Amino acid sequence: LQALTTLVQGLEEMEEPVVLVFFGDHLPYLGDNQLAYAELGFTARAEWDALTSYETPYVIWANDAAAQALDWEAAVASLDLPEDGRLSASFLGAAVLELTGRTGESPWFDFLNQLRRELPVVQKQAYQLADGTVTDQLTEEQAAKIAKWRQWSYYKLMYKEID
């Protein structure tokens, strides 16, 4: 935490606009339903849903120069992030590009931003809808979008030059 504080303090002093994205890693597996965490009092949640194990804390921060250049409050509001802040890590980069005004440059990232507005959290066992509902059932349209996302992800990784 001290290292992050030192980094932010240094970036605050810069006249150049800077946006910092910092994120951690999900919790390791410690028994069915993460029983060890509950027994240790590590989680404040009464129930452990299928997404909790994969939560990754993240921070998106801007120095004053970036906040002014981007109209930060309006830019953050336009992201339409869920109230609970949950967002799949695979959507974080696209959200940052949108936050910094770089929409329309890539059909891939535009697709990711469209998908994250509908399904901000995608995990193999569960999904979180935009209203915060956690489900393992998708509509046909949502399932088709997830299939497209997975296929496009594969081809983007393997072939790099696909639109």
Predicted regions mapped to residue ranges:
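Solvent-exposed soluble domains appended to multi-pass membrane proteins
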Residues: 1-163
